[in-house]
A protein has these predicted regions:
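C-terminal terminal-subdomain/extension
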Residues: 2-6, 17, 50, 89-239
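Short N-terminal edge-element motif at the start of the domain
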Residues: 2-70
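Pocket-edge structural micro-motifs
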Residues: 43, 60, 80, 103, ...
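Generic "edge-of-domain/loop-turn" microfeature
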Residues: 46, 63-64, 83-85, 105-106, ...
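Compact nucleic-acid interaction/catalytic patches
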Residues: 50-53, 58-97
Length: 239
């Protein structure tokens, strides 16, 4: 059975609400860098060998973002983001080499307001050069799933449903949410984000017996709410 590329739910004029978890100053500084994050002024090596600042989106798969659960991989795959008009629902199912990012710059009144990430303009950048202070947007889980669907289709011409993508990305996205909440609680106690992240990952990876870890348990949707409650209780106890 074949499937069409999916659009965000709801009316096109409200797609931004479905795509973005947060934009601009609303992005918590302790939110872990994740697939779909958009950064401004990322240093990219041009065809002439010079370095120029570009707006880019992180395209690295969530499971390949970090080597140890804490620190980003040294180099990350990104796609260039550029101005692009808003697509209609019919066009969204076409234009397969890009993903539309309507209202990415919601405060802009020029054509810079609407943009798109282009899958045939890829770069590999040093992760240390991605400044979280210049992060323009984070995607919702649904937004990440739509991004991955379009990327897989661009590379393979196969459409994988977002429902199937959710089944394999849900755990790692939930982990990012838990780390964000943990680091926010720790920040109120004056704990640096890097140290709080290490604490959270260590807690998630603690052996509960027989090699069972909370991190692995997050792969099963049935366990997620319980682990989030336990994480909140742990931060109250620690901080």
């Amino acid at each position: 059975m074949s499937h069409d590329l999916e659009t965000p739910p709801g009316e096109p004029g409200r797609w931004a609400e479905q795509l973005y978890r947060a934009r601009g100053e609303a992005i918590p500084r302790w939110r872990p860098v994740f697939t779909g994050d958009v950064f401004d002024a990322a240093p990219v090596t041009t065809s002439s060998g010079t370095t120029a600042g570009r707006t880019v989106m992180v395209l690295q798969h969530p499971c390949a973002m970090r080597t140890d659960g804490v620190n980003l991989a040294t180099r990350l795959l990104v796609g260039e983001v550029s101005h692009h008009r808003v697509l209609t629902p019919e066009e969204w199912r076409g234009f397969t080499k890009l993903m539309s990012l309507p209202d990415l710059n919601s405060s802009a009144t020029s054509r810079k307001r609407h943009q798109a990430v282009v899958f045939d303009r890829l770069e590999v950048v040093d992760s240390s050069a991605l400044d979280v202070g210049r992060r323009l947007a984070c995607l919702t889980h649904a937004g990440v799933n739509l991004l991955l669907q379009r990327r897989v289709h661009y590379d393979t011409r196969v459409v994988v449903t977002t429902h199937d993508i959710q089944a394999v990305t849900g755990g790692v996205y939930e982990e990012a949410d838990i780390i964000e909440d943990w680091c926010e609680a720790a920040s109120l106690a004056g704990i640096e984000t890097s140290l709080a992240t290490e604490d959270c990952v260590a807690w998630l990876r603690a052996d509960l017996g027989g090699g069972l870890m909370r991190q692995r348990m997050l792969e099963d949707q049935q366990n997620r709410s319980g682990i989030r409650r336990a994480a909140r209780a742990e931060t109250v106890k620690r901080y």
